[in-house]
UniProtKB/Swiss-Prot annotation:
UniProt cross-references to Pfam families, sorted A to Z: Phosphorylase
Modified residues (N6-(pyridoxal phosphate)lysine): 662
Name assigned to this protein: Glycogen phosphorylase
NCBIfam families for this protein: P_ylase, PRK14986.1
This enzyme's EC code(s): 2.4.1.1
Co-factor requirement: pyridoxal 5'-phosphate
Role played: Phosphorylase is an important allosteric enzyme in carbohydrate metabolism. Enzymes from different sources differ in their regulatory mechanisms and in their natural substrates. However, all known phosphorylases share catalytic and structural properties.
UniProt family annotation: Belongs to the glycogen phosphorylase family.
One example of a Gene Ontology biological process annotation: glycogen catabolic process
Record carries keyword Glycosyltransferase: yes
Lineage: Bacteria, Pseudomonadati, Pseudomonadota, Gammaproteobacteria, Enterobacterales
Residues of the signal peptide: none
InterPro entries xrefs: Glycg_phsphrylas, Glyco_trans_35, Pyridoxal_P_attach_site
Gene: glgP
Length: 815
């Protein structure tokens, strides 16, 4: 790299890496190799690998600046990037070299990788999608950066105590984070509260409290390319360290109280929003992210172009869900109040730069903020939102003069529920493009949630089906299968997943079929070892591994899965000597800390597991396992070992899902409803290679319209009746027989909102077909191979190309 002085780049040989790791341990960490522990060796290795990425990173940044390319800025409250070391070594192609260097020093790379804390800066699919997107942006050489919050405490650590979920803090930074660069000089004032003062036409926001947003940068490496991008995370810092006056008077606690209050903003991911103060902190968090980010975007733009006139030509800002939608009024505020734009010009810029992804159609999950709360914390922004709404409703009135109901429905301010600001509405009114994340979801979006807006802005809505990065989800997570693919297809599938299609031609070759089967068995043995060590449950790797790992939520219907497990248990008890296909049912996922029913479901899974796993009549025929503290790194262990992937949400509720893609890519067959991306997976893999059951989205709606009566299913279906009676009468909770009465009531007597009972029989019958196929191992593996072969479409590289071409209009950087 050109520099005004000479220096020697770090080289990539085993010997050089060995020296580098030892050097980092001694001179950066300051530790004697004789007494250093695994964490210190891990950090030294991370520093050594990071050094080898820095030049690429600086070169990429320099190229983006010199070519004055249009950039995309991707805003998300969540980024679940997973462990960084294995991914970085894979991107650089130095996995074996680092392994060799560590071995020469008597260390085991796999053990060090397991020491790395998984940064829990997200809750589920939203954050993992954002991470896959950053990986693809870098691999494709597209100019972009992610912006999020550097939470001190990530998603809580989940412990299972007496069958129940208990949360403890997840301090992922306890051993430091060598992967990040703190940018002491990149800091912005973020303001809250205060009041607005009109001075003629000019508006001033005064008497505010201030905190600072300080930047921390992480390198996002592209695979096998010099292109790298940046994830910039903001940490909150008090604008003044302590109140010295109070300190000198001896009031030490009061002296630091303000500092602590300020820094709470980036302390924890998603504070409990069941209280007013929790909701207020959540709003402050969202504004903290957008204010720091929009100030940074404008500052970077001005440094490069010395004008704001070309803003709309040079930047695209993407809002991942509604959490960062306050970016819109913040951009308006900065352009009008600080950069002397007229209101109309500022609005025009916003309409050109913002785009928004909708991730849910469920009304309870759509963000709204009380007008009073917004007015108290962000008075200037509320004023701007009112102005945008007035402008929008005026133009609407001109277009539809006789439709007063439409004005009420389309207004950004919901007047019917205690005056609330609808964030999704604000995003749709201002963004130039709004996308859903699967064909089904995008269609439902314009037919239901945004039907009025689809009529008002017909060209605004589009679909971009989600994808996953093959680097992390196949190359890193599944070395056994990757080796088989490399041998028969070459290595280029890592950057062009459509090349997996060639695997179709190998489905009938016994040798390849056997190799794929063996790779699966190796992964199952690895998971079985983990389950034995961590949970003290012995499972048979030759049994069918039936897996459902995702957030615990009623719409994802883990409960229906449990009903099938109990049905299976009852059948085995009735005829223990029959030839049963042995199964291991594996669950994993966290329930939101204030979500009573989801926590109840976890308790039920563990109670059922306790009874089944300790029943001598059952033995290896059926095991039930709940793996606690689900994370990206656990997903990388579990997904490659799955035979059957459970994607059983009620049709019309899951926007897309991405674990469905990860499982199929790793050779699991899917059992699922026609929901989210399952619909497109069916199109790609063919109806013979996927297990589809249950009502369609139309049938679900029809059932609701007719008046769904769950009790009828309970009374008509003997097996279902038996299962629900067992749960309700305490068969699985003998020490507390009434524990699940309310849960059973919610299904039979209180509407069964997610229609578990309606789909139960179809689901159980479909599971019987799964058993039949699993007995024909070669045929099962051939179908698994067809799934792998047809996953090319579901690469996040394809997804990002679509965003780049149709929404962001950005081109790759020339390196």
């Amino acid at each position: 790299m050109n520099a005004p002085f000479t220096y020697s780049s770090p080289t990539l040989s085993v010997e050089a890496l060995k020296h580098s790791i030892a050097y980092k341990l001694m001179f950066t960490i300051g530790k004697d190799p004789v007494v250093a522990n695994k964490h210190e060796w891990l950090n030294a290795t991370l520093f050594a690998v990071r050094d080898r990425l820095v030049e690429r990173w600086l070169r990429s940044n320099r190229a983006q600046l010199s070519q004055e390319t249009r950039q995309v800025y991707y805003l998300s409250m969540e980024f679940l990037i997973g462990r960084t070391l294995s991914n970085a070594m894979l991107s650089l192609g130095i996995y074996e070299d680092v392994q060799g260097a560590l071995e020469a020093m008597g260390l085991n790379l796999e053990e060090l990788i397991d020491e790395e804390n998984d940064p829990g800066l997200g809750n589920g699919g939203l954050g993992r999608l954002a991470a896959c997107f950053l990986d693809s942006l870098a691999t494709l050489g597209l100019p972009g950066r992610g912006y999020g919050i550097r939470y001190d405490y990530g998603m809580f650590k989940q412990n299972i105590v007496n069958g129940s979920q208990k949360e403890s803090p997840d301090y992922w930074l306890e051993y430091g984070n060598p992967w990040e660069f703190k940018r002491h000089n990149t800091r912005y004032k973020v303001r809250f509260g205060g009041r607005i003062q009109q001075e003629g036409k000019k508006t001033r926001w005064i008497e505010t409290e201030e905190i600072l947003g300080v930047a921390y940068d992480q390198i996002i490496p592209g695979y096998d390319t010099d292109a790298t991008n940046t994830l910039r995370l903001w940490s909150a810092q008090a604008s003044s360290e302590i109140n010295l006056g109070k300190f000198n008077q001896g009031d030490y606690f009061a002296a630091v109280e303000d500092k602590n209050h300020s820094e709470n903003v980036s302390r924890v991911l998603y504070p409990d929003d069941s209280t007013y103060s929790g909701r207020e902190l959540r709003l402050r968090q969202e504004y903290f992210l957008v204010s720091s980010t929009i100030q940074d975007i404008l500052s970077r733009h001005y440094q490069l172009h010395k004008t704001y006139d070309n803003l709309a030509d040079k930047i695209a800002i993407h809002l991942n869900d509604t959490h960062p939608v306050l970016s819109i009024p913040e951009m308006m505020r900065l352009l009008i109040d600080e950069h002397q734009f007229s209101w109309d010009d500022a609005f025009e810029v916003c309409c050109q730069v913002f785009s928004y992804t909708n991730h849910t159609l469920m009304s309870e999950a759509l963000e709204t903020w009380p007008v009073d709360m917004l007015g108290k914390i962000l008075p200037r922004h509320l004023q701007i939102i009112f102005e945008i709404n007035d402008y929008f409703l005026k133009t609407l009135q001109e277009q539809y003069p006789n439709d007063t109901d439409l004005l009420g429905r389309a207004s950004i301010i919901d007047e019917s529920n205690g005056r609330r600001v609808r964030m999704a509405w604000l995003a749709v009114v201002v963004s130039h493009k709004v996308n859903g994340v699967s064909e089904l979801h995008s269609n439902l979006m314009v037919q239901s949630l945004f039907a009025d807006f689809a009529k008002i802005f017909p060209g605004r809505f589009t679909n971009v089906t989600n994808g996953v990065t093959p680097r992390r989800w196949l190359a890193v997570a599944n070395p056994s299968l990757s080796a088989v693919l490399d041998e028969h297809l070459g290595r280029n599938w890592r950057t062009d997943l459509s090349l997996l299609n060639e695997l179709q031609q190998h489905c009938d070759f016994p040798m390849v079929n056997h190799a794929v089967h063996q790779a699966k068995l190796e992964n199952k043995k690895r998971l079985a070892e983990y389950i034995a060590q961590q949970l003290n449950v012995v499972v048979n790797p030759k049994a069918l591994f039936d897996v459902q790992i995702k957030r615990i939520h009623e719409y994802k219907r883990q409960l229906m899965n449990v009903l099938h497990v109990i049905t299976r248990y009852n059948r085995i008890k009735a005829d223990p000597d029959a030839k049963w296909v042995p199964r291991v049912n594996i669950f994993g996922g966290k329930a939101a800390s204030a979500y009573y029913m989801a926590k109840h479901i976890i308790h039920l899974i563990n109670d059922v597991a306790k009874v089944i796993n300790n029943d001598p009549q059952i033995g290896d025929k059926l095991k039930v396992v709940f793996i606690p503290n689900y994370s990206v790194s656990l997903a990388q262990l579990i997904i490659p070992a799955a035979d059957l992937s459970e994607q059983i949400s009620l049709a019309g509720t899951e926007a897309s899902g991405t674990s469905n893609m990860k499982f199929a890519l790793n050779g699991a067959l899917t059992i699922g409803t026609l929901d989210g991306a399952n619909v497109e997976m069916l199109d790609h893999v063919g109806a013979d290679n996927i297990f589809i059951f249950g009502n369609t989205a139309e049938e679900v709606e029809e059932l609701r319209r007719q008046g769904y009566k769950p009790r009828e299913y309970y009374e008509k279906d003997e097996e279902l009746h038996q299962v629900l009676t067992q749960i309700g009468s305490g068969v699985f909770s003998p020490e507390d027989p009434g524990r699940y009465r309310d849960l059973v009531d919610s299904l039979i007597n209180f509407g069964d909102h997610y229609q578990v009972l309606a789909d139960y029989r179809s689901y159980v019958d479909c599971q019987d077909k799964v058993d039949e196929l699993y007995e024909l191992q070669e045929e099962w593996t051939a179908k698994a191979m067809l799934n792998i072969a047809n996953m090319g479409y579901f690469s996040s590289d394809r997804t990002i190309k679509e965003y780049a071409d149709h929404i962001w209009h950005i081109d790759p950087v020339r390196l």
